[in-house]
Amino acid sequence: MAGKHKSNGVSPVSTSSPIDPFLADQGLLLLDGGLATELENKGYVLDTPLWSAHLLSTRPEAIREVHRAYLEAGANCIIAASYQASIPGFLAGGWTEDEATSLLRSAVILAQEAREAYLDSRPLPLRPLVAASIGPYGA
């Protein structure tokens, strides 16, 4: 049966994606430039195993400020401060499980808050995206 495609009976999956409007409008999706690097450029020391996720507890406003700066620079997608974040990582740092769960959620919430504040000051035809960052677990 050379040249014939054998169907497995599964319907094709929709390929619609949140990035499609950006690709259609501008041909690309511009991500932020690296949250931890910019936090370090601002003088924050990220020498804990949680890296920038440590600031979720100690300096959430710094994370929100950097997200906003990336949006102002033209980013279409900002990436949450969750790269090194994990429940075991927060537990090892002295937080309770409830606190750890709340901190993980706050990584995305801070990015969403930065996006909403940015959009309040400058309505855009395309709403910037917020993405979680998942690093190597337990690195």
Task: Describe the function of each predicted region.
Residues A2-A139:
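Domain-level signal for soluble alpha/beta catalytic cores
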